[in-house]
Amino acid sequence: MILVLLGTQDKPFLRLLKMVSKEIDKGNIKEKVVAQTGYTAFSDKNIESFDFKNKEEIEKLIDKARLIITHAGVGTITECLEKGKKIIVVPRLKKYLEHTNDHQMQITKEFEMKGYVIALYDKSRLSAALDKIKTFKPKKYESNSENFRMKIKDYIDNI
């Protein structure tokens, strides 16, 4: 199953959903696709979609997914990486009114440069990213949360 995640941003991100729909129509995606559409009005007979679910339900979907296609939300990306998922990241862009600025572009570039994700930029094609993801081996993601907790504990212990 492919899981598409648009996050909770209150601006629509129809561009990503249309890309996925187009690849289904072309036969490049043959498996089940589930999409969390958030505030994006969208309907497609080939995509099972919902606007929002609670955290536990999203985690179950992430666990079931073979591939994640997502916006460049740091929380979404890191959660999927921690679960060892292959991820295609498509940043929301200001010029399409998908966000208020282009910070998702920088986030995407950072995760891509570190070898964690396949990035899909404005002019690139989803079909190429789908081909690339087949052989892509993402770098293992190590969260800094535990390290941060240990530093706080050490600090408190030494007060």
Briefly describe each language-model feature range:
Residues 86-121:
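Catalytic binding pocket for nucleotide-activated donors in carbohydrate/polymer assembly enzymes
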Residues 49-52, 117-125:
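Short acidic-hydrophobic, aromatic-tinged amphipathic segments that line or gate anion-handling sites
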Residues 34, 120-131:
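Mobile beta-alpha loop/short-helix "lid" or hinge segments that flank ligand
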